[in-house]
Protein backbone atom coordinates (compact mmCIF):
# COMPACT_ATOMS: atom_id res chain seq x y z
CA UNK A 1 0.00 0.00 0.00
CA UNK A 2 1.69 3.17 -1.14
CA UNK A 3 0.75 6.67 -1.99
CA UNK A 4 3.07 6.32 -4.97
CA UNK A 5 0.21 4.66 -6.86
CA UNK A 6 -0.77 8.22 -7.70
CA UNK A 7 0.97 9.74 -10.71
CA UNK A 8 3.68 11.47 -8.67
CA UNK A 9 5.05 13.93 -11.22
CA UNK A 10 1.59 15.12 -12.16
CA UNK A 11 0.58 15.48 -8.52
CA UNK A 12 3.77 17.32 -7.58
CA UNK A 13 3.39 19.69 -10.55
CA UNK A 14 -0.22 20.35 -9.64
CA UNK A 15 0.59 20.93 -5.99
CA UNK A 16 3.49 23.25 -6.80
CA UNK A 17 1.19 25.23 -9.09
CA UNK A 18 -1.46 25.46 -6.41
CA UNK A 19 1.18 26.46 -3.87
CA UNK A 20 2.49 29.19 -6.15
CA UNK A 21 -0.95 30.56 -6.90
CA UNK A 22 -2.08 30.58 -3.31
CA UNK A 23 1.08 31.90 -1.69
CA UNK A 24 0.38 35.48 -2.70
CA UNK A 25 -3.20 35.64 -1.45
CA UNK A 26 -3.47 33.25 1.48
CA UNK A 27 -1.67 32.81 4.76
CA UNK A 28 0.64 29.83 5.16
CA UNK A 29 -1.89 28.02 7.36
CA UNK A 30 -4.72 28.52 4.86
CA UNK A 31 -2.41 27.35 2.08
CA UNK A 32 -1.45 24.24 4.06
CA UNK A 33 -5.13 23.52 4.77
CA UNK A 34 -5.94 23.71 1.06
CA UNK A 35 -3.01 21.43 0.23
CA UNK A 36 -4.13 18.92 2.89
CA UNK A 37 -7.63 18.93 1.42
CA UNK A 38 -6.28 18.33 -2.10
CA UNK A 39 -3.92 15.59 -0.89
CA UNK A 40 -6.79 13.80 0.90
CA UNK A 41 -8.91 14.05 -2.26
CA UNK A 42 -6.10 12.62 -4.39
CA UNK A 43 -5.59 9.69 -2.01
CA UNK A 44 -9.35 9.08 -1.86
CA UNK A 45 -9.51 8.69 -5.64
CA UNK A 46 -7.33 5.56 -5.37
CA UNK A 47 -9.21 3.86 -2.53
CA UNK A 48 -9.42 1.16 -1.41
CA UNK A 49 -5.73 0.26 -1.33
CA UNK A 50 -4.87 -3.18 0.06
CA UNK A 51 -1.58 -4.42 1.48
CA UNK A 52 -0.48 -7.17 3.88
CA UNK A 53 -4.00 -7.88 5.16
CA UNK A 54 -4.85 -4.21 5.70
CA UNK A 55 -6.95 -1.83 3.59
CA UNK A 56 -6.73 1.95 3.40
CA UNK A 57 -10.41 2.90 3.25
CA UNK A 58 -10.62 6.62 4.06
CA UNK A 59 -8.59 9.79 3.58
CA UNK A 60 -9.91 13.15 4.72
CA UNK A 61 -8.45 16.44 5.81
CA UNK A 62 -8.87 18.38 9.01
CA UNK A 63 -7.05 21.69 8.90
CA UNK A 64 -3.46 20.94 7.94
CA UNK A 65 -3.75 17.22 8.73
CA UNK A 66 -4.51 14.41 6.29
CA UNK A 67 -6.29 11.69 8.28
CA UNK A 68 -6.08 8.19 6.85
CA UNK A 69 -8.05 5.22 8.15
CA UNK A 70 -6.90 1.65 7.61
CA UNK A 71 -8.82 -1.47 8.59
CA UNK A 72 -7.62 -5.02 9.01
CA UNK A 73 -9.31 -7.23 6.45
CA UNK A 74 -11.94 -9.43 8.08
CA UNK A 75 -11.22 -13.12 7.78
CA UNK A 76 -7.72 -12.51 6.46
CA UNK A 77 -4.55 -13.40 8.30
CA UNK A 78 -2.34 -10.31 8.40
CA UNK A 79 1.37 -10.74 7.77
CA UNK A 80 2.29 -8.01 10.26
CA UNK A 81 1.01 -6.78 13.60
CA UNK A 82 -0.70 -3.37 13.42
CA UNK A 83 2.31 -1.69 15.06
CA UNK A 84 4.74 -3.36 12.65
CA UNK A 85 2.54 -2.41 9.71
CA UNK A 86 2.38 1.23 10.89
CA UNK A 87 6.17 1.34 11.28
CA UNK A 88 6.64 -0.05 7.77
CA UNK A 89 3.98 2.27 6.34
CA UNK A 90 5.56 5.27 8.09
CA UNK A 91 8.93 4.37 6.54
CA UNK A 92 7.34 4.16 3.07
CA UNK A 93 5.52 7.46 3.48
CA UNK A 94 8.59 9.30 4.78
CA UNK A 95 10.53 8.12 1.70
CA UNK A 96 7.81 9.19 -0.76
CA UNK A 97 8.70 12.45 -2.59
CA UNK A 98 5.08 13.67 -2.62
CA UNK A 99 4.70 13.12 1.12
CA UNK A 100 8.04 14.85 1.76
CA UNK A 101 6.84 17.85 -0.23
CA UNK A 102 3.59 17.96 1.73
CA UNK A 103 5.46 17.76 5.05
CA UNK A 104 7.74 20.65 4.09
CA UNK A 105 4.63 22.68 3.22
CA UNK A 106 3.25 22.17 6.75
CA UNK A 107 0.98 19.18 6.12
CA UNK A 108 0.83 16.46 8.80
CA UNK A 109 -0.56 12.94 8.52
CA UNK A 110 -2.54 10.95 11.06
CA UNK A 111 -2.80 7.24 10.30
CA UNK A 112 -5.25 5.07 12.23
CA UNK A 113 -5.65 1.30 12.03
CA UNK A 114 -8.96 -0.13 13.21
CA UNK A 115 -8.29 -3.79 13.94
CA UNK A 116 -11.61 -5.47 13.18
CA UNK A 117 -10.48 -8.72 14.83
CA UNK A 118 -9.68 -7.26 18.26
CA UNK A 119 -11.53 -3.95 18.23
CA UNK A 120 -8.29 -2.15 19.07
CA UNK A 121 -7.21 1.07 17.42
CA UNK A 122 -3.62 1.99 16.59
CA UNK A 123 -2.47 5.44 15.57
CA UNK A 124 0.63 7.08 14.18
CA UNK A 125 1.24 10.74 13.42
CA UNK A 126 3.67 11.88 10.75
CA UNK A 127 5.24 15.30 10.56
CA UNK A 128 8.60 16.79 9.58
CA UNK A 129 10.15 15.61 12.84
CA UNK A 130 9.01 11.97 12.63
CA UNK A 131 10.26 11.81 9.02
CA UNK A 132 13.58 13.49 9.84
CA UNK A 133 12.99 16.52 7.63
CA UNK A 134 14.68 19.68 8.85
CA UNK A 135 12.87 22.93 8.22
CA UNK A 136 14.56 24.92 5.48
Curated annotation (Swiss-Prot):
Disulfide bonds join 94-131. A lipid is attached at residue 25 (N-palmitoyl cysteine). One of its GO terms (cellular component) is cell outer membrane. A lipid is attached at residue 25 (S-diacylglycerol cysteine). Residues 1-24 form the signal peptide. Keywords: Cell outer membrane, Disulfide bond, Lipoprotein, Membrane, Palmitate, Signal. The keyword Protease does not apply. PROSITE patterns: PROKAR_LIPOPROTEIN. It is found in: Cell outer membrane. The keyword Lipoprotein applies. Disruption phenotype: Severely disrupts assembly and function of T2SS-beta, mislocalization of GspD-beta to the cell inner membrane. Its main location: membrane. Part of a type II secretion system (T2SS, formerly general secretion pathway, GSP) for the export of folded proteins across the outer membrane. Required for correct assembly of the type II secretion system-beta (T2SS-beta), for localization of GspD-beta to the cell outer membrane and for export of a labile enterotoxin by T2SS-beta. Each AspS2 binds to 2 GspD2 subunits and may clamp the monomers together, stabilizing structure and accelerating its assembly. Cryo-electron microscopy shows that the complex forms a cylindrical channel with 15 GspD2 subunits, each of which interacts with its surrounding AspS2 (GspS-beta). Belongs to the GspS/AspS pilotin family. Encoded in a type II secretion system (T2SS-beta); this strain encodes 2 T2SS but only this one (beta) is expressed under standard laboratory conditions. This is Pilotin AspS 2.
